Amino acid sequence: MSLTWTIFRTILLTPWLIWLCRSDVKSRRLPNAGTLGGLAAGLLVQSGWWGWSGLKDGLLAACIAVGFLLIPFLIRAAGAGDVKMLAACGAFIGLRWTPVFLMAVSFAGLLVAVWMLCRRQVTTARLKHAFRCLFDWRYDRKAGRAAIPAKDDERARVPFGVAIAIGTWATLLAELAMKN
């Protein structure tokens, strides 16, 4: 992997990530045109730069990223836009840096959630429900789901797209630091 490749991806990804962050913060939605378009662009850039091996690398990284958010998506703790954005960023990052990328995104997600909890911008009802669904076999899931604020309520959702963007930038910066 060359230094030019990392700089190219950083320059290419930055405006796209800023656009998705703004969309997620304002409307708590990540548009399909941005997420699926980003996934296609990531695979195209990987294959254009590295050929078939790059395409395979990007595709595997995207699949691992989808698998990473699959359980949170299934228990409704993450949205489909988050899954698609993570897959797109994984396609750009590539297989080699995927573990670092997923750890950076997780840590950034924790920081964003704590920040929003401290500023009282988000409620803990969804988080409590998710943990009780996972770890408490006696928990009444129907009653718990009824206590969660509606999905369109601003306080019910954390803009995880911001955490994905921060984790992507952190991974690219780590990659740049390792090359110098």
Regions found by a protein language model. Name each.
Residues M1-N180:
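A membrane-topology feature that recognizes alpha-helical transmembrane segments
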